[in-house]
C-alpha cells in the first residue's frame, strides 16, 4: 500500500475487493464513467477518466479507512459502517443494491426459541460482534428492567460459515446476514428477529474537505452516481392524446418535476413525454390506453443528471 503515498493528486475511493457488493459496485462505477484497469495482483487501480485512484479493500475495512481520512470516499454496506462503531462517517447515498437483513437465527427443528428475549444469557455466534452485543444488551435491559454493566449473553466471534455454528454446538443462536434465506434454510435455521436492515452506501469522512478541487470532484462523483441510480429507477414514457384527455392523463404521468407537452401538427392533439417509475411501467401504459392515449412508447434512460 506504499503506492498510495504517491497519489496525492488523486482522490482515493475505497471499494469492495470481493464479496456480495463487488460486482454491483463495478457496474455502478462503469455506469458513472469511472473507468479503470486493475491488475490481478494490485489492490489499487487508476481511473482513466477522472483523477481518482480506486483502493480495493475488504468491505469491513472500508469504514476505518474512510473514517480516519485515509480515503476520501467509500462504498460498503451499512452493516459494516454500524459494526465499525466509527461515528465520523457521513452516509451520502443509499445505492439501492446489496439489500439484506442482519437477523437472529435459531434451529428450526425443535422450535426451542421463538422470541429473542429467550436467548438472554445464552451463547450467540456472529461475525458482527458489536451489533450483536448492542442488540442483546438492549434485550437484557428490557428483561431486567434496569441498565446492564456486564452482559450475561455470550457473544462469540466466527469469521465465516456462521450458519454451521448451531449444528456443531458452538452456539445456541447466530446473528448473520440474510439475503434470499436459502443458506439459512439449508442450515436448518429460521429467523426470529431483525437486528438491522442494510444495503450498500456511498460514505465520506465527516470532516471539512480542505482541497477545493477535491471537494468539486466529490460532487461530480455524487452527481454521476445519482444519475445512474435515477436512470435505473425511471424510464421515459411518450404518448399522443387529444387535448380533452390531457388533464386526466397527466394524473397518471405527472413526471418527476413536470411532463413535457408539445402540440402536434394535428389540430387538438398533443404529445406528452414524462419520466415514470420503471417498476410501474406496464400498469401505467395500460391505464394510459384505457384513458384515451395512443402511440404509447417507453424508452430506456441510459444516464441522466437530476
Swiss-Prot record:
Q: Which GO terms describe its biological process?
A: L-histidine biosynthetic process
Q: What class of enzyme is it?
A: transferase
What are its GO cellular component terms?
A: cytoplasm
Q: Mind listing the UniProt keywords for this protein, alphabetically?
A: Amino-acid biosynthesis, ATP-binding, Cytoplasm, Glycosyltransferase, Histidine biosynthesis, Nucleotide-binding, Transferase
Which SUPFAM superfamilies does this chain map to?
Answer: GlnB-like, Periplasmic binding protein-like II
Q: What is its EC number?
A: 2.4.2.17
Q: Which reaction does it catalyse?
A: 1-(5-phospho-beta-D-ribosyl)-ATP + diphosphate = 5-phospho-alpha-D-ribose 1-diphosphate + ATP
Q: In which pathway does it act?
A: Amino-acid biosynthesis; L-histidine biosynthesis; L-histidine from 5-phospho-alpha-D-ribose 1-diphosphate: step 1/9
What's one GO MF term for it? Answer: ATP phosphoribosyltransferase activity
Gene3D superfamilies to which the protein is assigned, alphabetical: 3.30.70.120, Periplasmic binding protein-like II
The principal localisation class reads cytoplasm
The family database entries (PROSITE patterns) matched by this protein are listed as: ATP_P_PHORIBOSYLTR
Provide the protein's localization: Cytoplasm
What Pfam families does the database record attribute to this sequence?
Answer: HisG (PF01634), HisG_C (PF08029)
The UniProt function text for this chain reads: Catalyzes the condensation of ATP and 5-phosphoribose 1-diphosphate to form N'-(5'-phosphoribosyl)-ATP (PR-ATP). Has a crucial role in the pathway because the rate of histidine biosynthesis seems to be controlled primarily by regulation of the enzymatic activity.
Q: Which family does it belong to?
A: Belongs to the ATP phosphoribosyltransferase family.
Question: What is the recorded name of this protein?
Answer: ATP phosphoribosyltransferase
Q: Which gene encodes it?
A: HIS1
Amino acid at each position: 500500500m506504499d503506492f498510495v503515498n504517491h497519489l496525492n493528486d488523486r482522490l482515493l475511493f475505497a471499494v469492495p475487493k470481493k464479496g456480495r457488493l463487488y460486482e454491483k459496485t463495478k457496474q455502478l462505477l462503469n455506469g458513472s464513467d469511472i473507468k479503470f484497469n486493475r491488475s490481478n495482483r494490485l489492490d489499487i487501480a487508476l481511473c482513466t477518466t477522472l483523477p481518482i485512484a480506486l483502493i480495493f479493500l475488504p468491505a469491513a475495512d472500508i469504514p476505518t479507512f474512510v473514517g480516519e481520512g485515509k480515503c476520501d470516499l467509500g462504498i460498503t454496506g451499512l452493516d459494516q459502517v454500524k459494526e465499525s462503531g466509527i461515528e465520523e462517517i457521513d452516509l451520502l447515498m443509499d445505492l439501492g443494491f446489496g439489500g439484506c437483513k442482519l437477523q437472529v437465527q435459531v434451529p428450526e427443528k425443535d422450535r426451542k426459541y421463538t422470541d429473542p428475549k429467550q436467548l438472554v444469557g445464552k451463547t450467540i455466534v456472529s461475525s458482527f460482534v458489536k451489533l450483536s452485543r448492542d442488540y442483546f444488551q438492549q434485550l437484557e435491559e428490557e428483561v431486567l428492567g434496569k441498565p446492564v454493566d456486564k452482559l450475561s449473553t455470550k457473544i462469540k466471534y466466527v469469521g465465516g460459515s456462521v450458519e454451521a455454528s448451531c449444528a456443531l454446538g458452538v452456539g445456541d443462536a447466530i446473528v448473520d446476514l440474510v439475503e434470499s434465506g436459502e443458506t439459512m434454510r439449508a442450515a436448518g435455521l429460521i429467523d426470529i428477529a431483525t437486528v438491522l436492515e442494510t444495503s450498500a452506501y456511498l460514505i465520506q469522512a465527516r470532516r471539512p474537505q480542505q482541497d477545493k478541487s477535491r471537494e468539486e470532484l466529490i460532487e461530480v462523483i455524487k452527481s454521476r452516481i445519482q444519475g445512474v441510480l435515477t436512470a435505473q429507477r425511471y424510464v421515459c414514457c411518450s404518448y399522443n392524446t387529444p387535448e380533452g384527455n390531457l388533464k386526466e392523463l397527466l394524473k397518471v404521468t405527472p413526471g418527476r418535476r413536470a411532463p413535457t407537452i408539445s402540440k402536434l401538427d394535428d389540430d387538438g392533439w398533443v404529445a406528452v413525454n414524462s419520466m415514470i417509475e420503471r417498476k410501474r411501467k406496464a400498469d401505467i401504459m395500460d391505464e394510459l390506453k384505457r384513458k384515451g392515449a395512443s402511440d404509447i412508447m417507453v424508452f430506456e434512460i441510459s444516464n441522466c443528471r437530476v
